[in-house]
């Protein structure tokens, strides 16, 4: 696909928008290389990946990308034997941790039954290198400093360094405390010059201390001298520092060699994490744009529902339905300039390119997009100064090139076709060019302000006229696309509303041909009919959606009711079975005891017979009651709505709602409503008398104890955001108008995550960092709705 077309449709600006959602420079790099694909299966795979990432975000909020940095140059240096720096090892350790975290995160999602096969496949390519990560962490801290315990030798050297340094300082400080020091020294401090300890001596007392001058003040009045008394001590200190440097070099070289053994695995991890960042950035962009996954086809059919231009402010952009490639393969949008025709044309082109680049598009669910081998566009004033071409010539050169390469698998966009020359000749050329492209069966969207093209779509099969609606009341375009209705200039109406005298307008109308006036009247009538039809269709669609939702809700209620009923029946049967088993066990025990007495040839004693009879009686009635519940109501009591009853089948209490038949009632049991036969009901008590007092709904309010602050310090990022979500809900229930969230200052990652969550939370009115007395930027104050 030509770069010129991508630029004219401003695809590069879309990519810039998406890069803002990447978690790393690696992700941004891959996003900037994004380009449209032409293989349907590849496109579908990328769209599905974004869909899976969106599902992960809905369920978990985000994926863990902390620690993902670009260490590819360090890996290349390790391969050729260059020793890596402590800072580079810190970044490498962070990356290895990120690999481990991501692998565990995706694994946990799949174990929980979340279907993300494509993302799972990427995660399975990650290679964890726990031994290398632990080795690096045992030698280098998070700030890139080599730890004392990186080796026994380094620990010993640093112990010696601290001892020597302490001796040097003690000796110098004793010099500073001497009685003559205040006279001879510029300041009573120990400082460092050329990595050696020195004291500031006044110029005139240089000879009093001897030793080595390492530096001079800018005025020359002060000399920074290493006194002779500590030269040998400083030399010993320097020798120890050389040993420290050599040991650190040895440790870093060892770590570099171990890293070099795994550069291929690490490079693969970098590539996989880059791809995952790329996918999740596209998903975050889709969420921000309220974009959906388009249904892709290779048949050249486009149906965009409520399509919106992604580069226009989302609170101002007008959504349009655009269909192409079904009953008609060419659309010609006519009407005056500045009417929004070009925006519609660019929306179609840009959304097609976005879909082919594996991006979700800003359009409603169910939108369909086609895969084209090429998208051609002739948009805007592209005259070439270098070639000394006029606007018309420049456009014509572009059109000639399009005609050479266009095919049935092309999408062609013409903006103001035929403009820049004599109107009659331009209109004739426009129709001829459209005919030529239409014959190739390419998909075409063209805009023009030539009135001659208004009738173009009426006498050509597969061509449809369209226009952009103009509001006469406000004298401005609504940017609403009207398929099947050609455009008109509205010049007379606009002039009348702006105050042009009526006799001038009347004379102008008389200059127009009768045929032209009839066409304008026909178009006006079509516009009204189209608007009325759209309103009726919108109302019908709204009713249909409401009916579908109601039907779905009812089906769900039936499923839940049946599930509850089955559960209650199962519990009742289980209880009955348990009682039966207990009775049978008791009976068997009694029989065994009686048989034992008989086998011993003993006569039955009276108390033994009485006891056995009693135990049988205790066991059997319980079973019989459970098997044969009394299924009758009070004979002398007439049931009425509101009565509390017992449903004998389930042994559950309920309230009567209404009588549905001669011997049948609707009963409310908890959250369930069901029909029950009257014989299965037992009256418990009458309906309470209605109270005249106003009903009070009990909700959790200010007595519900929730702290006014939430401390997140020390929490992991994911756990912290989850706690914030729950805390805000609890705080609202508790009636708190304002709460504080303590996240600390740190690296700022948690603070940013909290701020981003608060921006979109339904219960948050506003948020700000704390004042000086409230904790500053380490605390966020939240005003609740």
Curated annotation (Swiss-Prot):
GO terms for biological process: mismatch repair; negative regulation of DNA recombination; rescue of stalled ribosome. It comes from the Bacteria. Keywords: ATP-binding, DNA-binding, Endonuclease, Hydrolase, Nuclease, Nucleotide-binding, RNA-binding, rRNA-binding. ATP binds at residues 335-342. Its EC number is 3.1.-.-, 3.6.4.-. GO terms for molecular function: ATP binding; ATP hydrolysis activity; ATP-dependent DNA damage sensor activity; endonuclease activity; mismatched DNA binding; ribosomal large subunit binding; rRNA binding. PANTHER family: OS10G0509000 PROTEIN (PTHR48466:SF2), OS10G0509000 PROTEIN-RELATED (PTHR48466). Homodimer. Binds to stalled ribosomes, contacting rRNA. Endonuclease that is involved in the suppression of homologous recombination and thus may have a key role in the control of bacterial genetic diversity. Acts as a ribosome collision sensor, splitting the ribosome into its 2 subunits. Detects stalled/collided 70S ribosomes which it binds and splits by an ATP-hydrolysis driven conformational change. Acts upstream of the ribosome quality control system (RQC), a ribosome-associated complex that mediates the extraction of incompletely synthesized nascent chains from stalled ribosomes and their subsequent degradation. Probably generates substrates for RQC. This is Endonuclease MutS2. It comes from Bacillus velezensis (strain DSM 23117 / BGSC 10A6 / LMG 26770 / FZB42) (Bacillus amyloliquefaciens subsp. plantarum).
């Amino acid at each position: 696909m030509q770069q010129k077309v991508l630029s004219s449709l401003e695809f590069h600006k879309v990519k810039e928008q998406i890069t803002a959602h990447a978690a790393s420079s690696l992700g941004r790099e891959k996003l900037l290389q994004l380009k449209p694909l032409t293989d349907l299966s590849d496109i579908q795979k990328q769209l599905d990946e974004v869909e899976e990432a969106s599902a992960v975000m809905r369920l978990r909020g985000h994926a863990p990308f902390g620690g993902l940095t670009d260490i590819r140059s360090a890996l290349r240096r390790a391969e050729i034997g260059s020793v890596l720096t402590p800072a580079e090892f810190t970044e490498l350790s962070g990356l290895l941790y990120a690999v481990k975290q991501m692998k565990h995160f995706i694994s946990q999602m799949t174990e929980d039954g979340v279907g993300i096969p494509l993302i799972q496949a990427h995660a399975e390519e990650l290679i964890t290198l726990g031994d290398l990560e632990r080795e690096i962490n045992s030698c280098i801290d998070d700030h890139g400093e080599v730890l004392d315990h990186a080796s026994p030798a380094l620990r010993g050297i640093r112990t010696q360094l601290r001892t020597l340094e302490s001796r040097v300082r003690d000796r110098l400080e004793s010099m500073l405390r001497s009685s003559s020091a205040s006279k001879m020294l510029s300041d009573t401090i120990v400082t460092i010059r050329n990595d050696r300890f020195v004291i500031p001596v006044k110029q005139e007392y240089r000879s009093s201390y001897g030793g080595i001058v390492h530096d001079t003040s800018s005025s020359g009045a002060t000399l920074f001298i290493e006194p002779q008394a500590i030269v040998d001590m400083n030399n010993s200190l320097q020798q120890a520092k050389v040993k420290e440097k050599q040991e650190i070099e040895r440790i870093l070289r060892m770590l570099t060699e171990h890293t070099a053994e795994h550069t291929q695995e690490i490079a693969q991890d970098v590539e996989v994490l880059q791809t995952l960042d790329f996918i999740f950035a596209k998903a975050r962009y889709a969420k921000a744009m309220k974009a959906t996954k388009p249904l892709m086809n290779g048949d050249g059919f486009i149906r965009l529902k409520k399509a919106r231009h992604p580069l226009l402010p989302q609170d101002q952009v007008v959504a349009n339905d655009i269909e192409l490639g079904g009953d008609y393969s060419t659309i010609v949008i006519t009407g005056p300039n500045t009417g929004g025709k070009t925006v519609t044309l660019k929306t179609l082109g840009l959304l097609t390119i976005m879909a082919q680049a594996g991006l979700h598009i800003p359009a409603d669910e169910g939108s369909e997009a086609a895969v084209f081998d090429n998208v051609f566009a002739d948009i805007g004033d592209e005259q070439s100064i270098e070639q000394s071409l006029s606007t018309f010539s420049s456009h014509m050169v572009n059109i000639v090139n399009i005609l050479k390469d266009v095919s049935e698998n092309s999408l062609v966009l013409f903006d103001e076709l035929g403009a820049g020359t004599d109107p009659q000749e331009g209109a004739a050329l426009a129709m001829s060019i459209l005919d030529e492209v239409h014959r190739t069966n390419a998909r075409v969207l063209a805009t023009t302000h030539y009135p001659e093209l208004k009738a173009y779509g009426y006498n050509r099969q597969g061509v449809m006229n369209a226009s952009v609606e103009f509001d006469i009341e406000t004298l401005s375009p609504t940017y609403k696309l009207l398929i099947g209705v050609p455009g008109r200039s509205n010049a007379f109406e606009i002039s009348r509303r702006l105050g042009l005298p009526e006799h001038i307008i009347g004379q102008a109308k008389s200059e127009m041909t009768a045929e032209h006036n009839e066409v304008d009247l026909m178009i006006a009538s079509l516009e009204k009919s189209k608007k009325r039809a759209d309103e009726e269709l919108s109302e019908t669609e709204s009713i249909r959606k409401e009916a579908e939702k109601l039907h779905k809700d009812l089906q769900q209620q039936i499923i839940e009711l049946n599930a509850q009923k089955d559960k209650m029946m199962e519990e009742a049967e289980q209880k009955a079975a348990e009682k039966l088993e207990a009775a049978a066990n008791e009976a068997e025990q009694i029989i065994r005891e009686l048989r034992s007495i008989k086998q011993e040839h003993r006569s039955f004693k009276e108390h033994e017979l009485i006891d056995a009879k009693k135990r049988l009686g205790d066991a059997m009635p319980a079973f019989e009651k459970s098997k044969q519940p009394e299924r009758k109501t009070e004979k002398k009591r007439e049931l009425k709505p509101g009565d509390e009853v017992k449903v004998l089948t389930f042994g559950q209490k309920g309230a009567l709602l209404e009588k549905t038949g001669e011997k049948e009632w609707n009963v409310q049991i908890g959250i369930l409503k069901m029909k029950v036969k009257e014989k299965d009901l037992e009256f418990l008590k009458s309906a309470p008398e209605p109270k005249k007092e106003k009903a009070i709904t009990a909700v959790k309010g200010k007595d519900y104890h929730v702290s006014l602050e939430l401390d997140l310090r020390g929490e992991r990022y994911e756990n912290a955001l989850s706690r914030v979500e729950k805390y805000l809900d609890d705080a609202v229930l508790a009636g708190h108008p304002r709460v504080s969230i303590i996240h600390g200052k740190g690296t700022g990652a948690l603070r940013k995550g909290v701020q981003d969550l608060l921006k979109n939370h339904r219960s948050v009115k506003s948020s700000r960092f704390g004042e000086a007395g409230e904790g500053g930027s380490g605390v966020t104050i939240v005003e609740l709705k």
